[in-house]
């Protein structure tokens, strides 16, 4: 047996391949560093994300908010969890893209599906803007009906009480929140 490969010494071929690989890796690192440190890098990334959101980058994977979503099997906790997380993610993405109404529908779906809806609403009250949170609260009454239609009779067996909301703002709470507070006081 010979120590040649295509007429070259095997050790020289291995050495040349190693040097070529290291040179290519250095080339990649250099240009990635140059790209990231460009002064307009972050602006380009933001513009690209806005363009994707505006041109339908999300629309291909987003179900319509009008209640035509594919309903998961309510007896499968993993499907329900996946649906809940999807609703939260879609709601946040839509609101970040400026579509507050459709985002509020998805977040309201998530709130109604959550076992700890009061805590989730409290979190959203702290993380969303006042306008966005108000839109979510306005969607809650119709969300119960929409989910009942989506899931059938099993949705009626779920939590029948509206979520409690703790208003942390100055002055009296908005009318929608006051209605929810008044509804829960009837249970005592």
UniProtKB/Swiss-Prot annotation:
The chain crosses the membrane at residues 13-31. One of its GO terms (molecular function) is mitochondrion targeting sequence binding. Keywords: Membrane, Mitochondrion, Mitochondrion outer membrane, Protein transport, Transmembrane, Transmembrane helix, Transport. One of its GO terms (biological process) is protein import into mitochondrial matrix. Residues 58-67 have a biased composition (Low complexity). Central component of the receptor complex responsible for the recognition and translocation of cytosolically synthesized mitochondrial preproteins. Together with TOM22 functions as the transit peptide receptor at the surface of the mitochondrion outer membrane and facilitates the movement of preproteins into the translocation pore. Belongs to the Tom20 family. This is Mitochondrial import receptor subunit TOM20 homolog. It comes from Caenorhabditis briggsae. The gene is tomm-20.
């Amino acid at each position: 047996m010979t120590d040649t490969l295509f007429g070259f010494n095997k050790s020289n071929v291995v050495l040349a391949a190693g040097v070529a690989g290291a040179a290519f890796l250095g080339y990649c690192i250099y240009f990635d560093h140059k790209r990231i440190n460009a002064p307009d890098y972050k602006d380009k990334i933001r513009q690209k994300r806005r363009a994707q959101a505006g041109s339908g980058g999300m629309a291909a994977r987003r179900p319509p908010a009008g209640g035509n979503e594919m309903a998961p099997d309510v007896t499968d906790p993993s499907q329900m969890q996946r649906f809940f997380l999807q609703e939260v993610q879609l709601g946040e993405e839509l609101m970040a893209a400026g579509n507050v109404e459709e985002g509020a529908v998805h977040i309201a779906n998530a709130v109604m599906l959550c076992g700890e809806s009061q805590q989730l609403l409290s979190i959203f009250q702290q993380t969303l803007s006042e306008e966005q949170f108000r839109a979510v609260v306005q969607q809650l009454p119709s969300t119960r009906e929409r989910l009942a239609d989506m899931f059938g009779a099993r949705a009626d067996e779920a939590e029948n009480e509206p979520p409690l909301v703790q208003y942390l703002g100055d002055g009296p709470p908005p009318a929608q929140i006051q209605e929810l507070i008044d509804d829960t006081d009837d249970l005592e």
